[in-house]
Amino acid sequence: MQLTEFNRFLKGLLQTALLAGLLSLSACETAPPVQEMSDARQAIAVAKEAGAADKAAFHLKAAEDYLESAEKALNDHEYSEARYDAKQAKAKALDALKASETSND
C-alpha cells in the first residue's frame, strides 16, 4: 500500500516537473527578427526605386504600415509579432514592386 502511494507521489511530481518545463519553454522569447526586418526594409527601398510611390502607392503604403508595426513590436520585445509583420511588409513591398513593373508595360 505504501509503495502505491509513493508511486502516485512520484507520478504527480514528474507531471508537475514536466508541466513546469513546458511552461518555461513557451515563455521563452524567440530571437529578434533581424534578418526579416532587414529584408522588409530592402524590399521597400527597391519598390520605391522602381517608382512604387507613384505606380503602386496602395501596396507601398501597406508595406510601410506593416514595417512600422514590426518596428513597434520589436521595440516591445514582441518578436513573433515583429517577425510576422516584417514578413508581411516584405510581401507587400514585393507586390508594390510587381505592380509598378506591370504599369511600365
Go through the PLM ranges and name each one:
Residues E29-L60, L67:
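Amphipathic, heptad-repeat alpha-helical segments
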Residues Q2-A17:
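Bacterial N-terminal signal peptides that target proteins for export
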Residues A52, Y79-A82:
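Charged, low-complexity interaction regions
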